[in-house]
Amino acid sequence: MDTQALSDLAAHIEGRMPDAVRSWQIHVGELTLLAERDHIVPLLRFLRDDQQCNFETFIDVCGVDYPERSERFEVVYHLLSMRMNHRIRVRIRTDEETAVPSVVSLWPAANWFEREAFDMYGIQFADHPDLRRILTDYGFEGWPLRKDFPLTGHYEVRYDDLEKRVIYEPVKLAQEYRNFDFLSPWEGMTTVIPGDEKAKEG
């Protein structure tokens, strides 16, 4: 779709769902809505059922972490209209305590995507039929895609041949983290940096 058609679509959505849409923008040929968290289910139902929108195909829902914000998480929904041949991205914001309404009632395929966002970020989804971890182990501590999660994690999980079972141990680093100097010509940089002009002459 061209920019004008996307602008017309955004105006149509905003006109029909004024309480749900906070703002919208067109970037790289795709329409993105910033929506109110508590209106996400009615908004997505409208996007699916309205004949001008017809976003019947649910593609994805994922989380994004912005730890500097008071509402640190964004939940991002991607929808596709195969009949109209266009896509839309819908973003909502939430904090660590406030649950986001689940959209499993609209698209059952959202089930595992919401579980993944819960497992990786700790984002809560209200009225989800089975909100439990899906990728990490049962006793896993923390939320691994949060930007404040330690790079090494908390525990090392390995199979022990002597005990014939999986064991958990605190992480032990064999060496300290390396601090790479990306401005050093010895680290593979091909451009000349100030003061290094003689290196090219020799």
Swiss-Prot record:
The protein's location, in the record's own words, is:
Cell inner membrane
User: From what superkingdom does this record's organism come?
Assistant: Bacteria
The UniProt entry lists the main location of this chain as membrane
Supply the name of the protein: NADH-quinone oxidoreductase subunit C
* Family from the record: Belongs to the complex I 30 kDa subunit family.
The primary gene name is: nuoC
Gene Ontology CC entries for this record:
plasma membrane
The record's annotation in InterPro entries points to: NADH_DH_suC (IPR010218), NADH_quin_OxRdtase_su_C/D-like (IPR037232), NADH_UbQ_OxRdtase_30kDa_su (IPR001268), NADH_UbQ_OxRdtase_CS (IPR020396)
**Pfam families this protein is in?**
Complex1_30kDa (PF00329)
Keyword set, alphabetical order:
Cell inner membrane, Cell membrane, Membrane, NAD, Quinone, Translocase, Transport, Ubiquinone
The record gives the membrane topology as: Peripheral membrane protein
The enzyme's E.C. designation: 7.1.1.-
Role according to the record: NDH-1 shuttles electrons from NADH, via FMN and iron-sulfur (Fe-S) centers, to quinones in the respiratory chain. The immediate electron acceptor for the enzyme in this species is believed to be ubiquinone. Couples the redox reaction to proton translocation (for every two electrons transferred, four hydrogen ions are translocated across the cytoplasmic membrane), and thus conserves the redox energy in a proton gradient.
Question: Which GO molecular function annotations are given, in alphabetical order?
Answer: NADH dehydrogenase (ubiquinone) activity; NADH:ubiquinone reductase (non-electrogenic) activity; quinone binding
